[in-house]
């Protein structure tokens, strides 16, 4: 998919598209304390990567809470990645009262977005998406939501995560 809609308008996605069965490419993002983080930092663990346009919106907030509460019951790790500033992500985590949420910022280089094909070119934000990776970083599930203001398929993503 190289085009989605956002609030009904067409948006072009840029970056390298990856598919189920591919090995996930590396990326460099920032944590809430401005430390660089890469995919290799989570080696040997299955991962649910929840991608949101902005943590401060209602749909993104609910998506982050849902994956955090449901997927965190499983062994593995849940990452939420957006192009928000790390400070905004840290503030959101504090105001949401969620201590164990891992939010990562792709604002600086859009490394994650470019490597996973989810940069909304017109907005310089990340498209809503979910990637599930096994412990060897093989993509076992991928969804790029066709309308950026809709929720992802929680059931399908969580089933893929639980069945690894």
Curated annotation (Swiss-Prot):
Belongs to the peroxiredoxin family. Tpx subfamily. PANTHER family: THIOL PEROXIDASE (PTHR43110:SF1). The keyword Ribonucleoprotein does not apply. SUPFAM superfamilies: Thioredoxin-like. Keywords: Antioxidant, Disulfide bond, Oxidoreductase, Peroxidase, Redox-active center. The active site is at residue 60. Thiol-specific peroxidase that catalyzes the reduction of hydrogen peroxide and organic hydroperoxides to water and alcohols, respectively. Plays a role in cell protection against oxidative stress by detoxifying peroxides. The keyword Nucleus does not apply. The active site is a conserved redox-active cysteine residue, the peroxidatic cysteine (C(P)), which makes the nucleophilic attack on the peroxide substrate. The peroxide oxidizes the C(P)-SH to cysteine sulfenic acid (C(P)-SOH), which then reacts with another cysteine residue, the resolving cysteine (C(R)), to form a disulfide bridge. The disulfide is subsequently reduced by an appropriate electron donor to complete the catalytic cycle. In this atypical 2-Cys peroxiredoxin, C(R) is present in the same subunit to form an intramolecular disulfide. This is Thiol peroxidase. Residues 18-163 form the Thioredoxin domain. It comes from Staphylococcus aureus (strain COL). The gene is tpx. Homodimer. It catalyses: a hydroperoxide + [thioredoxin]-dithiol = an alcohol + [thioredoxin]-disulfide + H2O. PROSITE patterns: THIOREDOXIN_2 (PS51352), TPX (PS01265). Pfam families: Redoxin. One of its GO terms (molecular function) is thioredoxin peroxidase activity. InterPro entries: Redoxin, Thioredoxin-like_sf, Thioredoxin_domain, TPX, Tpx_CS, Tpx_Peroxidase_subfamily. It comes from the Bacteria. Its EC number is 1.11.1.24.
